[in-house]
Design a protein with these regions (language model features):
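Catalytic beta-strand/loop cores that center a nucleophilic Ser/Cys/Thr
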Residues: 27-30, 51, 113-181
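Extracytoplasmic/secreted proteins, especially bacterial periplasmic and envelope-associated proteins
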Residues: 18, 22, 71, 126, ...
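Residue-level signal for short, function-critical loop segments
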Residues: 8-11, 191
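Extracellular ligand-binding/catalytic regions of CAZymes and related secreted enzymes
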Residues: 2-3, 29-30, 166-172, 179-216
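Helical hinge/lid and interdomain linker segments adjacent to catalytic or ligand-binding clefts
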Residues: 3-6, 15-90
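A glycine-rich, often tryptophan-bearing local segment used as a flexible ligand/cofactor-contacting loop or short
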Residues: 63-130
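Oxidoreductase and adenylate-handling cofactor-binding alpha/beta cores
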Residues: 99-106, 134-150, 191, 201-216
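Structural detector of well-ordered beta-strand residues that form the stable sheet scaffold
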Residues: 81-83, 152, 186
């Protein structure tokens, strides 16, 4: 099976160690060889990254060095898959726009903080096939997104929170897949804290998305 590299850190409010552990257990159960660390240095090790089949970054905000960013991006462009969730992948390294290009989106805001909202399945792709629309009680991410992403699920804003009424009716991608060079990239905005993965649909979408992104 594949070699999976999960690295966690950054803002602790997103429970990076716990959520990384959930992902590690999930992928280990699928037979993958999973390595978990809390440093970014291995991204700069070209020989190491060349044998990684899936990288899962769990780093809200924080900063990444030039060599580490270049190593990560080169690996994905060369065929290493990349998958992640919420701010751990799409609110990382805010000064690094090429990283954001690889991800396919960037967190902007979450009006109202923790709110009730619906996730709507938007594709018959195997990552979401057979999953019905479902409810979340968490942060509803408003994002800037790459229009070339293949959108798998969406959510619609009601414009009820924080006086941001002009977003009422906006349909926002929740999960997508894309390519970056030869690498497959999957992202889901679900997963603010570890208990968000107690929602079976949210966890299953993440499981399938990670498995899809692993280099064949």
């Amino acid at each position: 099976m594949g070699s999976v590299f999960i690295t966690w850190g950054g803002w602790n409010g997103h429970e990076p160690e716990k959520t990384a552990g959930i992902c590690a257990d999930m992928l280990s159960a699928e037979g993958h060889d999973v390595t978990v660390t809390n440093v970014l240095d291995p991204f700069a090790d070209e020989a190491f990254m060349a044998q990684v089949d899936l990288v899962v970054p769990v780093w809200t905000m924080s900063e990444i060095g030039q060599a580490e960013e270049a190593g990560l991006l080169k690996a994905v462009r060369s065929g290493t898959g990349c998958a992640g969730w919420h701010g751990g992948m799409a609110d990382s390294f805010r000064n690094n726009v090429e990283y954001q290009f690889m991800v396919g989106g960037q967190f902007i805001c979450h009006p109202g903080g923790i709110v009730d909202y619906e996730v709507n399945i938007a594709s018959d792709d195997p990552i979401v096939a057979g999953i019905d629309d479902f409810q979340m009680h968490s942060e509803q991410y408003f994002m800037h997104v790459d229009p070339s992403n293949e959108v798998l699920a969406t959510t619609t804003f009601k414009g009820q929170h924080c006086g941001i009424d002009w977003v009422k009716g906006v349909k926002m991608p929740v999960a997508w897949k894309k390519r970056y060079g030869r690498g497959k990239v999957f992202y889901s905005s679900l997963g603010h804290v570890a208990t968000d993965f107690d929602v079976p649909e949210a966890k299953e979408i993440m499981r399938r998305g990670c498995l899809w992104a692993v280099r064949p």
